[in-house]
Swiss-Prot record:
Main location: cytoplasm
Superkingdom of this protein's organism: Eukaryota
CDD domains referenced in this protein's UniProt entry, alphabetically: C2_Kibra (cd08680), WW (cd00201)
Protein's name in the database: Protein KIBRA
Claim: Coiled coil is one of the keywords in the record: yes
């Protein structure tokens, strides 16, 4: 019988409290009760008897405006916020205990990482001290530095300088890493202890919060969040003041120190071009698009609108994909695996440094201890490789895919923000964009991408607290993961493949036998015909980089030295006297020949005995046809002249007979200002090394080396065989203009038992034409044998080794010799066949007409440099039969003939299939890809609406007075706001985690504010002392460089700053949308996701403002 139909027992009465709550009076016992006495007959007595969601006798569900739903147990006269019908609290306790085990493992692994780093720091300090002592000893005799050391010596002056700079940079970097790691350890240790206290507190019998206790916790949490909001405002004010202080310092000193030669920019170059030729990437925009015609505004507007809608659809798809990936892994799982992976890499790095350290001044006991430590470390590493799990590989693969999606989402949001601003500036009435009337609008109330004003950077919310938007791995680990998964194998990586993270190197992979080979990315341009690149990726007058002024090595970049002589660099000319030069103009190796469009660069490494040979290294510069292939302005020629001559040089199949070759991939990361060098494999090693019982490694140096950058790296040693697979990557922090002035030196070396290094062969690669777009180019390079080079130098010694000379006579003699050998080479190359073998090229000849030819060529240069805006390149004999092409400046040309190119006269090479003269004329051949007028009429439909928009509509037909067509945003009243369909179940454990998390957040914010205040004091003190440059440690620390970028954003002009702010808001909103979508698509309930994020917060430090650096060496 239902309770309302049952009468109250005798002596009972129903009454109401002053707030309307019903209670019952027992007149017999003179007591009151909240429990209806009839419930004894209608309700279950225990929870075991309950059906569905009913509560047993004596339990009541109530609501508090501050706490929310809570439950009252009238039997014990207590309250609790946990639902007694749900066993969620017990599951939370189990999850917390499991997470404590994982966190303990990660913490112990990170402590071991710190110990290994400490050992590495001690070794690096010892190595730096030894190298510095060797440098001081060698510095006493400059003659021995130049003449006494060969290119294969460990103490080659330039290599020794790079060793010292790398060792110094390694010591400083390890110090900074240890300081950062120490702060992370402290944060994780505190978080781990906090979780342990929470677990102990909540495991007790009185672990549940009552109503008044929960209200007190919420009040404290709210007060801390207010303090956090004030702290965030103070932090932003400090950053603004730092941005103002930063303006008084020069922040680009690092690039200036690397650019020791002349600037490569057009404005500072001696290469006078008209203003309209300064941008060759799109000549159609020079004179034809200065302003958009009013007749074309509608078409431009429609085009931008379509791109805008497409970008928004792309963002929506990316958010769905990210939400799906995030639902497959919960926070904290990857952390322990990542720490174990980092620990293995740190141990391998320590092992590598133990192998390469030179124990010259060590005692026998110290050497034996080093060997024992090395063997013990090898055993530990082998055990770690054997226990590597397949699950780790799969999780790393998912994480790599997620980071790729995050990068794509960032690009898409930036594109949407840019298109939004363009649309607003294009039309005088863009109210339809900002009105929120169209579904999916940037600022619409539904489906908004832009975060509301409540989600400002200074407001504290639990979403910002627990959910770090799109947190990625650090750059080193992320790059390692990407290269780890390069092979694309879905199966388990075999043991023995975990590789090393070097100082600035990151990821290395080792392919399993029979695995898929890394495919080389073929270049879109052929072999260069001149030192100057006409690629839109680089400056028009960018020369190939000169070699180091202290390069006492016959392996020299001849292009670079000849090009530098054109600029008449007196310092370089004087330094050339230190080099071992011969009187002859012998040709040692074949010159590169042009490949057809789309083929890979020639693989032959071209070297010279002295500086006279035009090409002594493989230049990475693009071909003269790069304008046609890359910019889209000219149509690339179908067939280049001399293609038959290039057949032996333009592909991987053109391997020189008996030459050792190395495959290298180069990539520049514009966002992080880092240059990646991937050493893939070495083939035909038997040509350099006869004994197969030695270990071989690759030494890589970026020369000339600056003092503040790690520029010398070594791969791990492998047992000698005909083909060696390394797959190791090295990262160099460097600006893109500075990279253009660098040369990459690659040496194959062996190390004996006494740790002495001997170089067998090498090559030098120009970095002048490294692509800025982030694409990776993979090429093969032939290596020059140093033994063969020394043998030839002993046979031919007409000049001998010259000591450093500073007089003008020596400089003139070297310059004359260089010009003489260069012209000799040009004359000899005209009559040579492209199939001439390497042995035939070693001939000694002299020509008496060199000086006269050189003088005539210099006169040509002076005459042609006098022209203001047209440069004519003298055609080769093969081009005499081709008529000159006439081109209009404002249009493009389409012809199967070679594309005209602007080239400096001394940069051209004789025997090259050269181009026709670049002259003005009346004949105009228009490109298929561009026309000044519309090919067909635009079909426009005007829509009459409240917003008076005239864009091409994709919406349903117009309906007058419809809400979706109004220009004024219609806000829903608060009464109609939909309530949450589900309410998260909150327990006492959730409240305690929230309280401790806000305390931790506030503590971390206080530390960041103190760091910013200290940094501000240091900068003010440096400014008061008259210093013009930022401290060196501040420029080198990667985390502080990110802070400097943040400061630079604040100094942008108003339009750029507004666009950056809009992009940041969109990314924050997208992160929250992904978080919301993940809760909808995840198989687990949202309570589980939320609780895991709360636990992971305490052991995942977010160091937004790093600690101040330790003292440098």
């Amino acid at each position: 019988m239902p309770r309302p139909e049952l009468p109250l027992p005798e002596g009972w009465e129903e009454a109401r409290d002053f707030d309307g709550k019903v209670y019952y009076i027992d007149h017999t016992n003179r007591t009151t009760s909240w429990i209806d006495p009839r419930d004894r007959y209608t309700k279950p007595l225990t929870f075991a008897d309950c059906i569905s969601d009913e509560l047993p006798l004596g339990w009541e569900e109530a609501y508090d405006p501050q706490v929310g739903d809570y439950f009252i147990d009238h039997n014990t006269k207590t309250t609790q916020i946990e639902d007694p019908r749900v066993q969620w609290r017990r599951e939370q306790e189990h999850m917390l205990k499991d997470y404590l085990v994982v966190a303990q493992e990660a913490l112990s692994a990170q402590k071991e990482i710190y110990q290994v780093k400490q050992q590495r720091l001690e070794l690096a300090q010892q190595e730096y001290q030894q190298l510095h002592a060797v440098w001081e000893h060698k510095l006493g005799s400059q003659v021995s530095l130049v003449s006494g050391s060969s290119s294969s010596s460990k103490y080659d002056p330039e290599i020794l300088k790079a060793e010292i700079a790398t060792a110094k940079s390694r010591v400083n970097k390890l110090k900074r890493e240890m300081v950062h790691l120490q702060h992370e350890l402290q944060f994780k240790e505190r978080g781990f202890q906090t979780l342990k206290k929470i677990d102990k507190k909540m495991s007790d019998a009185q672990g549940s919060y009552k109503l008044d206790e929960a209200q007190a916790v919420l009040r404290e949490t709210k007060a801390i969040k207010k303090a956090i909001t004030c702290g965030e405002k103070e932090k932003q004010d400090l950053i603004k003041s730092l941005a103002m202080l930063k303006d008084g310092f020069r922040t680009d000193r690092g690039s200036h120190s690397d650019l020791w030669s002349s600037s490569s920019s057009l404005e500072s170059s001696s290469f006078p071009l008209p203003k309209q030729y300064l941008d060759v990437s799109s000549q159609t925009d020079i004179s034809g698009s200065f302003g958009i015609n009013s007749n074309n505004q509608l078409a431009e507007k429609v085009r931008l609108r379509l791109r805008y809608e497409e970008a928004k659809r792309r963002i929506a798809n990316l958010k769905i994909q990210l939400a799906k990936l995030d639902s497959e892994a919960w926070p904290g799982v990857l952390d322990s695996e990542r720490d174990r992976l980092i620990l293995i890499n740190e141990k391998e790095e320590l092992l590598k440094e133990m192998r390469f350290i030179s124990p010259r001044k060590w005692t026998q006991g110290e050497v034996e201890q080093l060997e024992m430590a090395r063997k013990r470390l090898e055993k530990d590493l082998q055990a770690a490789r054997d226990t590597q799990s397949k699950a780790l590989t799969e999780r790393l693969k998912l994480n790599s895919k997620r980071n790729q999606l995050v990068r794509e989402l960032e690009e898409a949001t930036r594109q949407v923000a840019t298109l939004h601003s363009q649309l607003k500036s294009l039309s005088s009435s863009m109210q339809s964009l900002s009105s929120g009337s169209s579904p999916g609008s940037l600022t619409s109330s539904r489906g908004s991408l832009v975060a509301s004003s409540l989600d400002s950077s200074t407001s504290a919310s639990f979403t910002d607290l627990y959910y770090d938007p799109f947190e990625q791995l650090d750059s080193e680990l992320q790059s390692k993961v990407e290269f780890l998964l390069l092979e694309g194998a879905t199966g388990f990586r075999p043991s023995g493949c975990i590789t090393t993270i070097h100082e600035d190197e990151v990821a290395k992979t080792q392919k399993a036998e029979g695995g898929g080979r890394l495919q080389a990315l073929r270049s879109l341009s052929g072999t260069p015909k001149s030192m100057t690149s006409l690629s839109p990726r680089s400056s028009l007058s960018s020369p190939s980089p000169p070699c180091s002024p202290l390069m006492a090595d016959p392996l020299l970049a001849g292009d670079a030295f000849l090009n530098s002589l054109e600029f008449e660099d007196p310092e370089l000319s004087a330094t050339l006297c230190e080099l071992s030069l011969g009187n002859s103009a012998q040709e040692r190796y074949r010159l590169e020949e042009p490949g057809t469009e789309g083929k890979q660069l020639g693989q032959a490494v071209n070297t010279a005995q002295g500086c006279g040979l035009k090409v002594a290294c493989v230049s990475a510069a693009v071909s003269d046809e790069s304008v046609a292939g890359d910019s889209g302005v000219y149509e690339a020629s179908v067939q280049r002249l001399g293609a038959s001559e290039a057949a032996a040089f333009d592909s991987d199949e053109s391997e020189a007979v008996g030459a050792t070759r190395i495959q290298i991939a180069l990539k520049y990361d514009e966002k992080n200002k880092q240059f990646a060098i991937l050493i893939i494999q070495l083939s035909n090693l038997s040509a350099l090394l006869q004994q197969q019982d030695q270990k071989v490694n690759i030494r890589v140096a970026v020369l000339p080396c600056s003092e503040s950058t790690t520029c010398l790296f070594r791969t791990r040693p492998l047992d000698a065989s005909d083909t060696l697979v390394f797959n190791e990557v090295f990262w160099v922090s460097m600006s893109y203009p500075a990279l253009h002035q660098k040369t990459l030196r690659v040496d194959v070396c062996t190390t004996d038992r006494s740790h002495l290094e001997e170089c067998l062969g090498g090559a030098q690669i120009s970095l002048a034409e490294v692509c800025r777009s982030g694409e990776r180019s993979t090429r093969w390079y032939n290596l020059l044998s140093y033994k063969y080079l020394k043998k030839q130098s002993r046979e031919l010694k007409p000049v001998g080794v010259m000591a450093p000379a500073s007089g003008p006579a020596s400089t003139d003699a070297v310059s004359a010799l260089l010009e003489q050998t260069a012209v000799e080479l040009e004359k000899r190359q005209e009559g040579r066949s492209s199939t001439q073998t390497l042995e035939d090229s070693w001939r000694y000849e002299e020509t008496s007409e060199n000086e006269a030819v050189a003088e005539e060529e210099e006169e040509e240069v002076e005459e042609e440099e006098g022209e203001e805006d047209v440069f004519t390149e003298k055609a080769s004999p093969d081009m005499d039969g081709y008529p000159a092409l006439k081109v209009d400046k404002e249009t493009n040309t389409e012809t199967p003939a070679p594309s005209p190119t602007v080239v400096r006269p001394k940069d051209r090479r004789v025997g090259t299939p050269s181009q026709g003269p670049f002259l003005r004329g009346s004949t105009i051949i228009r490109s298929k890809t561009f026309s000044p007028g519309p090919q067909s009429q635009y079909v426009c439909r005007l829509n009459r609406s409240d917003s008076d928009s005239s864009t091409l509509s994709k919406k349903p037909p117009f309906v007058r007075n419809s809400l979706e067509r109004r220009s004024v945003r219609m806000k829903r009243p608060s009464s109609v706001k939909s309530l949450r369909s589900e309410r998260l179940i909150r327990t006492s454990l959730d409240l305690e985690l929230d309280l401790q998390a806000t305390r931790t957040w506030h503590s971390q914010l206080t530390q960041e504010i103190s760091v910013l205040k200290e940094l501000k004091e240091q900068l003010e003190q440096a400014k008061s002392h008259g210093e013009k440059e930022l401290p060196q440690w501040l420029r080198e620390d990667e985390r502080f460089r990110l802070l400097l970028r943040m400061l630079e954003k604040r100094q942008m002009d108003r339009a750029e700053h507004k666009g950056e702010l809009q992009t940041d808001k969109m990314m924050r909103a997208a992160a929250k949308d992904v978080h919301r979508l993940r809760g909808q698509s995840c198989k687990e309930p949202p309570e589980v996701q939320s609780f895991r994020e709360k636990m992971a917060f305490f052991t995942r430090p977010r160091m937004n403002i790093p600690a101040l650096s330790a003292d440098d060496v």
